[in-house]
UniProtKB/Swiss-Prot annotation:
Binds 1 zinc ion per subunit. One of its GO terms (molecular function) is zinc ion binding. The active site is at 694 (proton donor). L-methionine binds at residues 431-433, 484, 599. It comes from Klebsiella pneumoniae (strain 342). Its cofactor is Zn(2+). CDD domains: CIMS_C_terminal_like (cd03311), CIMS_N_terminal_like (cd03312). One of its GO terms (biological process) is methionine biosynthetic process. This is 5-methyltetrahydropteroyltriglutamate--homocysteine methyltransferase. It is an enzyme of class 2 (transferase). Pathway: Amino-acid biosynthesis; L-methionine biosynthesis via de novo pathway; L-methionine from L-homocysteine (MetE route): step 1/1. Catalyzes the transfer of a methyl group from 5-methyltetrahydrofolate to homocysteine resulting in methionine formation. Its EC number is 2.1.1.14.
Length: 753
C-alpha cells in the first residue's frame, strides 16, 4: 500500500498574474482570442510541470478556469441564461465572459450573473441560474480538452469536476418558482457522458467535488446523493471530495455511496481519523487533507505525520492539500524582501506541494528526519517577540461590556445627526473608492520603489483627492468620499499601518474573474502605532462644505481578508484589530469628520459552515464591530457596508451592529435582499445598491428609479439612501461619471415626485 500525494487544485492566475493581464487585454480589444487561449495553455503546462517537479504524484486537471470554475461547470452543462446566449445557440469564451461580467468583445451586453462567496472563502463564484423545464447538454468541452493537453504532455492526472448536487445547491431559481433539486435527473446524463469520455481516455480516478457535504443540509438534499452517485458509478473510480469543514454529521450518508474513495479536510474539520477509518468501507481509498490550502503557514509535518501514521498499511491512503491551493499564493521563493526568520514560517502553493512530498516519503519509509527538520521554524515562532505584545494582550483583557455600547440609542442619535447634517430625502453617496487610474497606480508604484520622495507623492495624492471632491460636487452628490487614491486595497492599506501584519511582494490570490488580491498576513498581536486615515480625511473635508466620510475597513473584514495567525483564535485577532481602529474613530471624530464608514463586507462570509456554530461567531463578530464604533458621539453617523450577502438568517446580528446607516449590495438580486430588512422591521437607515459596479454597463435613470421604487415598497423612503453596490475602484471614469450622474438624477426625480 504505497502512499501517494496529490493536490485538489492549483492557483490559476500565474506568478505574475499573467492570466489577469491576458483577460483584461482581451476585453479591452488589445489581444486576440487566440492570444488569450495561448496564455491559458502556457499557464496550465507550467503549473502542471511545477507541481510535478515539487513532488506531486497525481496532478489536477480541470481546476483552471477562465473566470470561475462554477461558471465553467455551467457551460459544461449547457446552462447559459437566455440573455447571454449566442444567436446561433453556440457557446464560446465570450459567452462565459458575458455571464461573468455583463459584456465581452462579441455579443450584446446583458446584466451579469449574480456573484457570491465560495463557501466561507474570499473567492467568488458566478451563481448558476435555473428555470423551470430547463434542458442540459454537453456543449463546452474545456475539461476534456485540458485532459487531452495534460495527457499529451505525459502527466499522470486526476480530472476535477464539481459534483452535481453541490452544483445545484449553489444555484438560484429564476422566473417561476420550483425546486431546483428536481433538475438532478436532468443534469446526471451530462455527467455520465463526461465520465464516459474520461474513461475512453484511460483516466483511472476522477476527483468529484461535493463540498456541500460539509454543510448541515436539508434532508431532501442529503438523500439526493445516493441516487445521483448510483447513476454515476462504474465508468471511472470516483474520489468524492469534501473540504472547508468536517463530515462527521453526514458520514453515514457518505459511507453508503457507491464511490471508491473519499477526500476529507483534516485541517478545518474536526473529524477523528480513527473514526473515519472504522466507519468507511474497508476497500475505499482515504485522501487525507493534511496541508492547509487556505493559509500561508509552514505545516508542522511532525504533527501531520502523527495524525495519520496509524492508518499506514491499514487502507489505501493518499495525502493531499485540505482544499484547492487556489486560495494560496503560488511561490514563496520569489519573496526577496521578507527577512529570513519570517520567511521560514511560510509555505505557499509550491512549497505546500513540497510538504506533501516530504510527508509522503516519511509515511512510506518511516524516516522522520526530513519532516522534523522542516518543522523546526514552527517551534521557534511560538516563542518569538515578533508574535507577542504584552500591552496589546493587557488591553484586550481589560475590555468591558460598556466599551461596545454607543452612548445613546439609535432614535436619539438619528435626531442629533439630522440636525447636524440636514441632508435631503433620498441622500446620495458612494461606497468609498473612485477609479484607480493608471496615473494613480503609477504614483503609488513609483513611491513604493523609491523613485518618488514622500513630498512629491503626497502632493500627487492630494491632487487626486481634490479631483475626486470636484467630480462629486459637480455630480451633485450629498455625502462625499475622498476616493482612496492612496489605497491599493482596502485591507492591505490598513495592514500596512498596523503593527502585527506583514506583506508579500507577489502573494496574489484570485478573488473573482481577473481580480486578484494580495492579503496581508497577521503574524503577531495587532496594534496601531499612529493615526492612519486622519490626515487625508481632514484634507478632503477642507475642500468642501458637504460632509466627507471617513473610511475604515472593519475588524472582521480585515481578519477574513487576511491570512490569519493559527496560534490564537479568530476572535482574539478581530478584537485586537477593533481596539486599534477604535482609536482611529476617535481621532477622525476629533479632526471634525462627522460621518465614518466602517466596512464589514466579510461579516457574513466569515460564518462557520455549520449553522450550529453561527451564534458564537456572530456574538464576537458583532462585538468587534461595536468595540470599533462605540467610541463615537451621538452626532457622529456610523455607516457600514456589506456586499454579496444573504441577510435573512443573520438579521438579528445585522441589527445588533447598531450602525446608523447600512449600505448593501442589492442590484444584481433586483432588491430581493431588502425582503429580509422589511420582514425584520429593520429600524435604522439603509442604502440599497442601485447599480452593479462589477459590470461596466451604465444603468439608466429609469432603471435606477425603478429599483428605488421597489426599495420604497419595503423600506420607508425617509430611511433610504441612494448609492452604488460597492466601491468604484475597478471602473473607469467615463462610466463612473455617467452612472453616478444617472443615480443623482434618479434621486432628484424621486424628491420631486
Amino acid at each position: 500500500m504505497t502512499i501517494i500525494n496529490h493536490t485538489l487544485g492549483f492557483p490559476r492566475v500565474g506568478l505574475r498574474r499573467e492570466l489577469k493581464k491576458a483577460q483584461e487585454s482581451y476585453w479591452a480589444g488589445n489581444a486576440t482570442r487566440e492570444e488569450l487561449l495561448t496564455v491559458g495553455r502556457e499557464l496550465r503546462a507550467r503549473h502542471w510541470e511545477q507541481q510535478k517537479q515539487a513532488g506531486v504524484d497525481l496532478l489536477p486537471v480541470g481546476d483552471f478556469a477562465w473566470y470561475d470554475h462554477v461558471l465553467t461547470t455551467s457551460l459544461l452543462l449547457g446552462n447559459v441564461p437566455a440573455r447571454h446566449q449566442n444567436k446561433d445557440g453556440s457557446i464560446d469564451i465570450d459567452t462565459l465572459f458575458r455571464i461573468g461580467r455583463g459584456r465581452a468583445p462579441t455579443g450584446e451586453p446583458a446584466a451579469a450573473a449574480e456573484m457570491t462567496k465560495w463557501f466561507n472563502t474570499n473567492y467568488h463564484y458566478m451563481v448558476p441560474e435555473f428555470v423551470k423545464g430547463q434542458q442540459f447538454k454537453l456543449t463546452w468541452t474545456q475539461l476534456l480538452d485540458e485532459v487531452d493537453e495534460a495527457l499529451a504532455l505525459g502527466h499522470k492526472i486526476k480530472p476535477v469536476l464539481l459534483g452535481p448536487v453541490t452544483y445545484l445547491w449553489l444555484g438560484k431559481v429564476k422566473g417561476e418558482p420550483f425546486d431546483r433539486l428536481s433538475l438532478l435527473n436532468d443534469i446526471l446524463p451530462v455527467y455520465q457522458q463526461v465520465l464516459a469520455e474520461l474513461a475512453k481516455r484511460g483516466i483511472e480516478w476522477v476527483q468529484i467535488d461535493e463540498p456541500a457535504l460539509v454543510l448541515e443540509l436539508p434532508p431532501a438534499w442529503l438523500e439526493a446523493f445516493k441516487p445521483a452517485y448510483d447513476a454515476l458509478q462504474g465508468q471511472v473510480k470516483l474520489l468524492l471530495t469534501t473540504y472547508f469543514e468536517g463530515i462527521s454529521d453526514n458520514l453515514a450518508t457518505i459511507a453508503a455511496l457507491p464511490v471508491q474513495g473519499l477526500h476529507v479536510d483534516l485541517v478545518h474539520g474536526k473529524d477523528d481519523v480513527a473514526e473515519l477509518h472504522n466507519r468507511l468501507p474497508a476497500d475505499w481509498l482515504l485522501s487525507a487533507g493534511l496541508i492547509n490550502g487556505r493559509n500561508v503557514w509552514r505545516a508542522d509535518l511532525t504533527e501531520k505525520y502523527a495524525q495519520i501514521k496509524d492508518l499506514v498499511g491499514k487502507r489505501d491512503l493518499w495525502v493531499a492539500s485540505s482544499c484547492s491551493l487556489l486560495h494560496s499564493p503560488i511561490d514563496l521563493s520569489v519573496e526577496t524582501r521578507l527577512d529570513a526568520e519570517v520567511k521560514s514560517w511560510f509555505a505557499f502553493a509550491l512549497q505546500k506541494c513540497g510538504e506533501l512530498a516530504l510527508l509522503r516519503d516519511a509515511l512510506n519509509s518511516g524516516d522522520t528526519a526530513a519532516i522534523t527538520e522542516w518543522s523546526a521554524p514552527i517551534q521557534a515562532r511560538r516563542h518569538s517577540t515578533r508574535v507577542h505584545n504584552a500591552e496589546v494582550e493587557k488591553r484586550l483583557a481589560a475590555i468591558t461590556a460598556q466599551d461596545s455600547q454607543r452612548a445613546s440609542p439609535y432614535e436619539v442619535r438619528a435626531q442629533a445627526q439630522r440636525q447636524r447634517f440636514n441632508l435631503p430625502k433620498w441622500p446620495t453617496t458612494t461606497i468609498g473608492s473612485f477609479p484607480q487610474t493608471t496615473e494613480i497606480r503609477g504614483l503609488r508604484l513609483d513611491f513604493k520603489k523609491g523613485n518618488l520622495d514622500a513630498s512629491h507623492y503626497r502632493t500627487g495624492i492630494a491632487e487626486h483627492i481634490k479631483q475626486a471632491i470636484v467630480e462629486q460636487e459637480r455630480l451633485g452628490l450629498d455625502v462625499l468620499v475622498h476616493g482612496e487614491a492612496e489605497r491599493n486595497d482596502m485591507v492591505e492599506y490598513f495592514g500596512e499601518h498596523l503593527d502585527g501584519f506583514i506583506f508579500t511582494q507577489n502573494g496574489w490570490v484570485q478573488s473573482y474573474g481577473s481580480r486578484c488580491v494580495k492579503p496581508p498576513v497577521v503574524i503577531g498581536d495587532v496594534s496601531r502605532p499612529q493615526a492612519i486615515t486622519v490626515d487625508w480625511a481632514k484634507y478632503a473635508q477642507s475642500l468642501t462644505d458637504k460632509p466627507v466620510k471617513g473610511m475604515l475597513t472593519g475588524p472582521v473584514t480585515i481578519l477574513c481578508w487576511s491570512f490569519p495567525r493559527e496560534d490564537v483564535s479568530r476572535e482574539t485577532i478581530a478584537k485586537q484589530i477593533a481596539l486599534a481602529l477604535r482609536d482611529e474613530v476617535a481621532d477622525l471624530e476629533a479632526a471634525g469628520i462627522g460621518i465614518i464608514q466602517i466596512d464589514e463586507p466579510a461579516l457574513r462570509e466569515g460564518l462557520p459552515l455549520k449553522r450550529s456554530d453561527w451564534d458564537a461567531y456572530l456574538q464576537w463578530g458583532v462585538e468587534a464591530f461595536r468595540l470599533n464604533a462605540a467610541v463615537a458621539k451621538d452626532d457622529t453617523q456610523i455607516h457600514t457596508h456589506m456586499c454579496y450577502c444573504e441577510f435573512n438568517d443573520i438579521m438579528d446580528s445585522i441589527a445588533a451592529l447598531d450602525a446608523d446607516v447600512i449600505t448593501i449590495e442589492t442590484s444584481r438580486s433586483d432588491m430581493e435582499l431588502l425582503e429580509s430588512f422589511e420582514a425584520f422591521e429593520y429600524p435604522n437607515e439603509i442604502g440599497p445598491g442601485v447599480y452593479d459596479i462589477h459590470s461596466p454597463n451604465v444603468p439608466s435613470v429609469e432603471w435606477i428609479e425603478a429599483l428605488l421604487a421597489k426599495a420604497a415598497q419595503r423600506i420607508p423612503a425617509e430611511r433610504l439612501w441612494v448609492n452604488p453596490d460597492c466601491g468604484l475602484k475597478t471602473r473607469g471614469w467615463p462610466e463612473t461619471r455617467a452612472a453616478l450622474a444617472n443615480m443623482v438624477q434618479a434621486a432628484q426625480n424621486l424628491r420631486q415626485a
